[in-house]
Amino acid sequence: MTRTKRLSAMLAAPMCLLTLAGVLPWQPALAEGAVQSVGQQHAFDFHFGTWRTHILRRASAQKWVKMTGTVIDQPLWGGRANLEKIEASGSGSHFQGLTLFLYDPKSGQWSQQFASSSDGIMDEPLYGRFANGRGVLYGWSGDGRKLLERDTWSDTTPSSYHFEIASSADGGKTWVKEFIAQLTRLEKVPDYDTPHTAGNGPEHDFDFNLGRWQTRIRAVLNPLSAPEVWTNFRGTHTVYRVWDDWADVGQLEVDGPSGHEEDMALRLYDRKTQQWRVYFANSASGTLEPPMIGRFKGGVGTFVFLDEIGGKTVLVRNVWSGITPKSCHQDWAISADGGKSWVPTWISTDTLGH
C-alpha cells in the first residue's frame, strides 16, 4: 500500500505535517511485539562531531586515488537521524556531498541516502543495522551500472572509526572494495550551520527562509471526505545551510491534536536543471519521501509531484509566496484533474522574531 492509498486511514493515524499537504500520512503506531530497539536507534551516536578523513578511492582495477577531507555529522531528532556532510580533495579532484541517515522504528533498521553537489539528487537508499559494534547497510550503487553496494562501519572508538564501500556484481557472493576511509575525530565545535554567501542566483532562492521561525498551520486531515474540516498546529520552523550554494535543511516541530510532531525538509539544488528538489521525512516513520521539484519565479516558489489516490494519479502542489524579511506563506493543494482545479490541504505562515 502506497502512502496515498492510506488516505482513508488518515484520521486514525498521526500525520507527517510537512507532507500532510500532499496527503502523506505518518506510519501507524507500532503494534505490540514490533521491533523496538533503543540501542539500535542510537547506533550512530559515535559518529556525531567533526572528523578528519583519509580516503582511498578506486579509480580503476589497478589504481587508487588518495584524498583527504573533513566530515561533519549532526544529530537530528535526538539521534534517530543524522546528517553528514563531507568535503574532500586529492589528485586534482574535489567534491562535496551529504548523507542523510534515518532510523525506522517499525523495522528497527537504518537507511542512508547520499547526494553530491554535482546534481543535488539523492541516491537510492541503503538499509541495514548495527550488531556487535559493526554497521552494515546494503542497497544499489548510485553510479552507472547497478551493482549491489555494501557500506560498512567498523573499529569504532570515541576518537576514530573505519568505513568502507564495496560492490558486488554477483548478488553478494564476492565483493570488490571501492572506497576506504579512516577517520579521526577533530577536537573542534562542529560547524552545523554553514555560513552562507549572499547572492541573487537561483541557488539562493531559499535564503529568505534561513533562521528560526514561529509557524502557524491550518491543515485538512482528510481532503476527500472532509475538505471543510481544518485542524490547527503551532510550533517552530528552523532552517539552516548544509552547503553554501546547494543544500539546506528545514526542521519543523509543532504541537497539535495528536501531540508533538517532528518533520524535516531537505532542499537540494540541481545546478544542471536550475531546479530544487525537496525531500521530506518525519521522525515517526524514519523514511524519506520522493521529492517535490520546482523553482522560484517572480518571488513565488512552485513545487509539484505526482501521487496516487484511489488508483488515480493526482498532482500535489506547494506554493511559497508573501515573502518578506520577517514572514513567508505556504499553500498546499491536490488536483485530480491535471491542475484545472485544486483542493487546498494546508496553509501556513512563518514569522520571524515573534
Across the structure, where does each feature detected by a protein language model lie?
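Intrinsically disordered/low-complexity terminal segments and short unstructured peptides
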Residues: 1-3, 18, 49, 173
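Bacterial N-terminal signal peptides that target proteins for export
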Residues: 2-16
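A general, composition-driven signal for non-globular sequence regions
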Residues: 8, 21-22, 261
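C-terminal segment of classical bacterial N-terminal signal peptides
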Residues: 18-28
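Hydrophobic small-molecule pocket/channel-lining residues, especially in calycin-type beta-barrels
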Residues: 30-354
